Amino acid sequence: DESLLIQNLKQYFDFEVRRQEFVGPQVGSELRDQGGLGLLAALAVMMVYIMFRFQYKFALGALLALIHDVLIVLGFFSFFSLDFDLSVLAAILAVIGYSLNDTIVVSDRVRENFRKKRRSDSEIAINRSLSQMIGRTLITSLTTLLVLIALLIFGGETISNFSIALIVGVISGTYSSIYIVCNTLLSLKVTSEDLMIRKTEVLDDGMP
């Protein structure tokens, strides 16, 4: 009992309880639901951004990659029966941002190669893009994982699940941005015509 605990502590320590807070299961479920809505909102906003920044085929590839990464993290925690709390939800949001960053790097390189050689075959252009950026992606992921592993080892039990979620998400996001996004573009038969420079882009580039 809480009152009994306070009485026992007062026998050894001189203190005064000025405020008590209790987070019940209802509040916890509300926070979980709000976090889930925030997760969906983040996915929607990112898809709209990629659609306008690149093209809808790239948005579909990014969506599949992000869903894949989220499911991998959730499946990992479910398989090993790890606690899922708000810190893990925050880690999933961070994983979405990390994976999206890799996806944008890949998409930008694919678009650049298509525009350089308009008559290039889609498979050749995408393979060339992967060859050009895979080293950068792997080095970035490895350096990030080193930091996260150190955080897991020395960060304590409080943030252990947060660190685990980020480690799993970074590994998943690395290969999903390379394989899932590019294979989706090949399946959707993206061509150089899909990535023609619009007049608005030309005007923007010509502005001081």
Where are the predicted features?
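A structural signal for conserved, well-ordered secondary-structure elements
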Residues: 1-208
